[in-house]
From Swiss-Prot:
Protein name: Codanin-1
PTM sites of type Phosphoserine: 270
Biased composition (Polar residues): 61-72, 219-238
Biased composition (Low complexity): 77-88, 95-116, 138-179
Length: 1239
């Protein structure tokens, strides 16, 4: 694989062709000549991507990055990185490596070696040792841990075949002054003292002047970049203050230098040193430590062309989903962007490789300038993904001074994306729900075997909530332990649940409480038996948004465990996890698995929104937002249930390490392969992919598999599931935006969760890099049907960050760079700007809304749950009806006013007309201010309708006081819902409706505008005796002899006696014409419905698909009757319809396909209709040609396709032929003259 990379660096093979060669098992014809140089390396093709990732990690070994070390799940190519002699093989599985491998120890006289990593290794293996980042408490902290030497993971030193790393010497003289390797006699080793909690020295922070947007701003809670405090722990931080500093010491650097000397001197005299202290003048090269950021300069970039080429290769692999984790690579790139310094290497090493820039022996990153340049190049290729990140991350990227210096164009694009983004991700966790109420339909006496079992269940339910309340009160105390405090009570409670029915009832209670408490993001919230009061609303602060941001930063977890955190149970989920562990009940676990499986199947099959509302459906905006919220609730519930199902199902098999021997592993595999899965996830996954519901199925399935043990991925059943997921991952290419494919954010969510799954420690490292032939049997398509969830934008940034909180690590990494300090918790510092409290309490009127909410909550707490549901239902429907009422009354009146004003302007201007845009702006400026009446009318509507609805739905026996309170609460909730929507959307709604009316009138304006204006209403002689449109539509929908029945008779199977007479068709069209000419009661919706039905009738007439009543020999309409009916329809379209008629449907594949079922096929009516449409200016030649072109692209039977092509050529060549009669046999003749003669 090193040869492949060198060929790319020497530009012997184009990058695009090489990426296609890597991504496909069979190269295409156009790539065969370009990748001929790589044909000999085809067996090693799958190893190129892991080699490239490890190569980049090795090249960045001397970089001191910002933030924690990041894992890379990449097996090492054995061809490029041979195994160390004597190291045992591990079945072909690669080893684990850090994104930033070990830094090289410097000279003994100048630098102290890095501290060895405290985390354990999985064992020897070929290539760099790989370790999982952020694994709970076991992960090493940034400030106190360095890296092990490069040869500690089994890699050969430089000169033995490991490319890219600096040359290391094994014969360096020992550093006798290093107190870590050579401590003084009689002292305690540093490791024991390092476990004591050190005191923290507070460094003074100088106040700097305000900086521009492109420079990071400092606050008083974090030091500036130039004064980063040392992250080396020390228990002697307070002692040097008594040593007396000289009065002339004015520099912080001098002060630190003296403190180092004092610590070194005192440490040599003290019997218990805290940590190794380097000698004076030799700073410890920690990750950020006490090193200031080195400025990056684009002019000092070395090997610019080489870096651009490697960045292009790397970005192409990311774009084609050839890397396991997209966001892990972005985190690595941002670490390069925010790297502070590089550990210096020997000058001889760099000089020896100056001549071969295209060789892998030459370091890729020689300086910070190279790192930043490479990172910016990759970010430019990944801008599409960056633009979908949250608003805070975009702001930090746009303000990064290095990015501005290296690529002002990218910085401008990021700033534009930030200004246009509305993706504000909130981390505030809503309070948890109350306790599960009594369920009379399932928890009554009739569902238990005896009175004793019933009373035992009620008692155990009370014990369960006592345990939950005690956990809530004490779980945040450091000295409190769940098992010691609650374990015995839980096991005693489970022992009394002896009957199976008692277990099933308790499991149902357990599951419902789990969903109520943990369904919110993070799963943490307020009290169990009642929501905590909203303190912020009670304060009534002037800047409530600032206080909410402060609340968000205080209660949100600071870090999710790095970009690849292990599966955990945050917040309230920890209680349920510990409860299951302490119960240790096989009966309870089995009932719980059954209940969770059933609920997952139920939610996974739930019918969810399948379409996105269009621009014309303004009234359904609120309903669409509600449907998106419903999808989010269902998805989060599925992920929560699947997480606990996986935890319980794989709990008996989970262990820290895989089986030690191959024989033991084979025996376990043979045994486990006979055990059926607890849930048929393979069938559910295949159903989700076929139904285009992967965006709902895959996230919860990933949660289930994340708790699998080491044996699960080796079982054939689960191996096929992982292979199917891998195929799906490779098909989710973000750059493909074809029509009908999966939405971008839907793809991004799936890529994020799948990438996280592939980094789980129990998933084999080589699983992601399977050969294409091993996954060809599982074909996956991302082209979504019109009825699939995948094509609907149901995922937004809030849901993306809720399901994948580790994406927020990108923002925390950039924020730590701005703050200038890595801190002690992984390099992330949260800046909090304090808000003054002088105005708190000065606005008593602003607390009324909060008091009303508390009073309503107290009222519902003392009433049955059905009362709350009734009031909320009434408020929801009355609010929605209010919006529709405002649109039908106020907005409709304003539209009529706009039409009248437009008529006056058209009459006054005559033939001159005017600019439509100016007319629209003029009308909107006059009418939009009247939208303020919507709030007043909305309040009146809610006050008038809500009490009536509440009284109708509540029982008659409801007390008057309760009824009155419920009515008032319903009025308030409905008014708040309606007014909030109207205040935000009424102006846009008025503009949209006025624009539609203006466009419709301008299209209808002809050479005689006065006549057109007069024709919009009824004629003066109209007596309004025409059939009402509502009656006509009712007949179309329900009456047995109606136009809809005609269409139904023609469309489906029917009895021989069913049919319609030509006289009835003429009568029905005459009634339609009367209704269209009498405009008094005709609304646009009814007119659109009639227009669509008339077009469908014309299509059936052309295809001769209407059954006719009469003798048995006559089943088709005569040509004369059909032409007369088509003439009537053309007249209606031309003279009577004033709205748009969807004439394009006449040439849709569905309607033209009706001719395929006719034997013999006759095309004269279609030719006649097309010619008349052109002559009456109802459709243009170009429009018909476009429709015909789309028809030719459709899939037809062979003979039908030839007839269509011949007919279209005749129409386009001879558009004015007099009524030709063409049959199918005539269209198949090759000679056009014969066809015309027979016509």
């Amino acid at each position: 694989m090193a040869a492949v990379l060198e060929s790319l660096l020497r530009e012997e093979v184009p990058v695009a062709a090489a990426v296609r060669w890597i991504a496909r098992s069979t190269p295409s014809s156009e790539d065969s000549s370009e990748v001929a140089a790589l044909s000999a390396l085809r067996p090693l093709r799958k190893e190129f991507v892991p080699f490239l990732l490890n190569f980049l990690r090795e090249q960045s070994s001397r970089v001191l990055p910002q933030g924690p070390s990041t894992p890379a799940k990449t097996p090492v190519a054995s061809a490029a990185l041979p195994a160390r002699q004597g190291a045992p093989a591990r079945g072909g599985r690669g080893a684990r490596s850090q994104l930033f491998p070990a830094a090289e120890p410097l000279s003994a006289a100048a630098e102290a070696p890095l501290a060895r990593r405290a985390g354990r290794r999985r064992g020897p293996g070929p290539g760099p040792s790989r370790e999982r980042g952020g694994r709970g408490s076991g992960a090493a902290e940034e400030g106190a841990s360095g890296e092990s030497p490069p040869w500690a993971g089994g890699r050969k030193p430089k000169g033995s075949g490991s490319p890219g790393s600096p040359r290391l010497s094994l014969s360096d003289p020992p550093n006798l002054s290093n107190l870590e390797e050579f401590p003084p006699v009689g002292t305690v080793p540093p490791g024991s003292a390092g476990r004591t909690k050190p005191s923290r020295r507070i460094n003074p922070t100088p106040v700097s002047e305000e900086r521009s947007l492109s420079k990071p701003k400092t606050c008083f809670t974090s030091p500036p970049i130039s004064c980063v405090p040392s992250s080396q722990p020390s228990t002697l931080d307070t002692s040097p203050w008594g040593l007396g500093l000289p009065p002339g010491c004015r520099s912080l650097q001098e002060e630190r230098e003296m403190l180092r000397k004092a610590r070194t001197k005192q440490l040599q005299q003290s019997p218990t040193p805290a940590s190794p202290i380097p000698e004076s003048g030799s700073p410890v090269p920690s990750r950020t430590g006490n090193l200031t950021a080195e400025p990056a300069d684009p002019a000092r970039v070395s090997s610019r062309q080489r870096l651009e080429l490697v960045a292009l290769i790397y970005s192409s692999c990311i774009a084609e989903n050839l890397v396991p984790n997209l966001f892990l690579e972005l985190f690595f790139v941002l670490q390069l962007l925010t790297a502070r310094r590089m550990v210096a290497t020997k000058d001889s090493d760099l000089e020896s490789s100056q001549g071969a820039l295209d060789s892998l022996d030459t370091p890729l990153f020689r300086s910070i300038h190279d790192c930043v340049f490479f990172a910016v190049q990759v970010l430019e290729h990944q801008f599409q993904v960056l633009s979908y990140l949250d608003k805070g991350t975009l702001k930090l990227l746009a303000e990064n001074e290095r990015l501005l210096c290296f690529s002002p164009a990218l910085q401008g694009r990021l700033r534009a994306a930030y200004e246009g983004s509305v993706a504000k991700v909130s981390l505030v966790i809503p309070p948890s729900a109350q306790a599960v109420s009594f369920q009379p339909e399932t928890d009554n006496r009739a569902n238990f075997s005896s009175d004793r079992a019933f009373h035992t269940f009620k008692k155990q339910r009370d014990v369960f909530y006592e345990v939950l309340r005690e956990w809530e009160d004490h779980h945040e105390e450091p000295s409190w332990d769940f098992e010691k405090g609650l374990g015995s009570r839980i096991r005693a409670m489970m022992g009394q649940l002896s009957a199976a029915c008692s277990h099933s009832h308790f499991v149902r209670l357990f599951q419902k409480q789990l969903l109520q408490m943990c369904q919110s993001p993070g799963g943490a919230g307020g009290s169990v038996l009642g929501e905590a009061p909203d303190v912020l609303n009670m304060l009534g602060a002037d800047k409530l948004g600032r206080l909410r941001q402060l609340q968000e930063r205080l209660i949100a977890p600071q870090s999710s465990g790095g970009p690849c955190p292990p599966p955990t149970f945050p917040g309230c989920q920890g209680f349920f996890r510990d409860f299951i562990m302490s119960a240790s009940s096989f009966h309870f676990n089995q009932h719980l698995m059954d209940s969770l499986s059933l609920k997952i199947r139920e939610l996974n099959g739930l019918r969810l929104p399948q379409h996105e509302p269009g621009d014309e459906d303004g009234e359904s905006d609120m309903d669409w937002q509600g449907e998106r919220r419903q999808f989010a609730v269902v998805l989060l519930s599925l992920r929560l249930l699947a997480k606990f199902l996986g935890f319980v199902a794989f709990l008996p098999y989970r262990g820290h390490e895989p089986p030690p021997t191959r024989e033991l592993q084979d025996s376990i595999l043979a045994l486990r392969s006979q055990v059926p899965p607890v849930l048929d996830i393979r069938a559910l996954l295949q159903q989700g992919l076929w139904a285009r519901r992967a965006v709902l199925t895959v996230p919860w399935l990933v949660e289930f598999l994340s708790f699998a043990d080491h044996i699960v991925p080796l079982l054939d059943y689960y191996r096929s599931v992982f292979t199917l997921l891998l195929r799906l991952h490779r098909s989710l290419v973000l750059s493909k935006e074809n029509e009908g494919e999966m939405c971008f954010l839907n793809k991004l969510l799936l890529l994020a969760v799948l990438g996280w799954l592939f980094q789980i420690p129990t998933v084999p490292e080589d699983l992601f890099f399977l050969e294409d032939g091993q996954v060809d049997a599982f074909e996956v398509t991302t082209t979504a049907s019109e009825h699939g969830l995948d094509s609907v934008p149901v995922v937004d940034q809030q849901l993306l960050y809720t399901c994948c909180p580790y994406i927020g690590e990108l923002r925390k990494l950039l924020a730590s760079w701005v703050s200038g300090s890595s801190g002690r918790s992984g390099g992330f510092v949260r800046k909090i700007t304090p808000t003054t409290t002088s105005s708190l309490g000065a606005l008593p009127l602003q607390t009324s809304q909060g008091l009303q909410a508390q009073l309503a909550e107290a009222f519902f707490h003392n009433q049955p749950p059905s009362l709350r549901r009734t009031v909320e239902f009434v408020a929801e429907r009355i609010g929605s009806n209010c919006v529709k009422h405002i649109k039908a009354t106020l907005v409709a009146d304003l539209v009529h006013q706009a039409e009248s004003l437009l008529q006056e302007q058209l009459v006054a201007r005559g033939q001159e007309g005017g600019d439509p845009a100016q007319l629209l702006e003029s009308l909107c400026s006059q009418l939009c201010p009247h939208g303020a009446q919507a709030l007043t009318q909305g309040r009146e509507f809610c006050q008038r309708k809500s009490p009536t609805a509440v009284r109708a739905l509540l029982p008659e026996e409801t007390p008057a006081a309760v009824l009155s309170s419920a009515e008032n609460i319903a009025v308030g909730l409905a008014t708040e819902k309606a007014c909030s929507w109207l205040s935000a959307n009424i102006t846009a709604l008025i503009r949209r409706e006025v624009k539609a009316a203006v466009s419709r009138m301008l299209r209808a304006q002809g050479p005689e505008p006065t006549a057109r204006v007069e024709r919009r209403g009824c004629s003066r002689a109209c007596e309004h005796h025409a059939p009402l449109p509502s009656h006509l539509i009712s007949e179309i929908k329900f009456h047995h002899c109606s136009l809809q029945d005609v269409l139904s008779l023609a469309a489906g199977p029917r009895d021989p006696e069913e049919g319609v007479s030509p006289e009835h068709l003429e009568q029905l069209l005459n009634q339609m014409g009367q209704s269209l000419r009498c405009r008094q009661f005709l609304c646009p919706t009814a007119e659109q419905h009639l227009a669509k039905c008339s077009v469908e009738l014309a299509s059936l007439l052309v295809a001769d698909q209407i059954p006719i009543l009469g003798p048995p020999t006559q089943h088709r309409l005569e040509r004369g009757h059909a032409r007369r009916l088509l003439h009537m329809l053309l007249s209606l379209w031309k003279d009577d319809f004033q709205g748009p008629v969807p004439l394009q449907l006449l040439l849709s594949p569905r309607n033209v396909g009706l001719l395929a079922d006719t034997r013999p096929r006759e095309w004269d009516l279609l030719l006649f209709l097309l010619r008349e449409l052109v002559e009456k200016d109802l459709m243009g030649h170009l429009e018909i040609e476009a429709c015909l072109g789309r028809l030719n692209e459709a899939q037809w039977p062979g003979d039908f396709s030839e007839e269509l092509s011949t007919l279209f050529r005749l129409f386009l060549a001879e558009p004015h032929l007099l009524e030709p009669q063409l049959r199918a046999c005539e269209l198949m003749q090759p000679n056009r003259g014969t066809v015309l003669a027979q016509s």
